[in-house]
């Protein structure tokens, strides 16, 4: 597993970020989407 930083915009227009462990960028995005109900868009997923 790798560590990914996911930056996203919430439905209220605020920017936020969170990291998680995942096997791929798409898996990291899915994990963050499951944890945050208020995501409007994913802005960046990068391995850290």
What are these language model-derived features?
Residues 24-32:
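Low-complexity, intrinsically disordered Gly/Pro/Thr-rich segments
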Residues 34-48:
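Short, mixed-charge low-complexity intrinsically disordered segments
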Residues 1-15:
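Short aromatic-glycine-(Arg/Gly/Cys) micro-motifs in beta-strand/loop hairpins
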Residues 13, 32-35:
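Preference for short coil/turn "hinge" residues that link or interrupt alpha-helices
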Residues 13-23:
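A short, exposed loop/beta-hairpin motif centered on an aromatic-Gly-Thr core
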């Amino acid at each position: 597993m790798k560590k990914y930083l996911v930056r996203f915009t919430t439905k209220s227009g605020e920017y936020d970020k969170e990291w998680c462990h995942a096997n791929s960028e798409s898996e990291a995005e899915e994990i963050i989407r499951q944890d945050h109900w208020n995501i409007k868009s994913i802005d960046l997923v990068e391995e850290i």
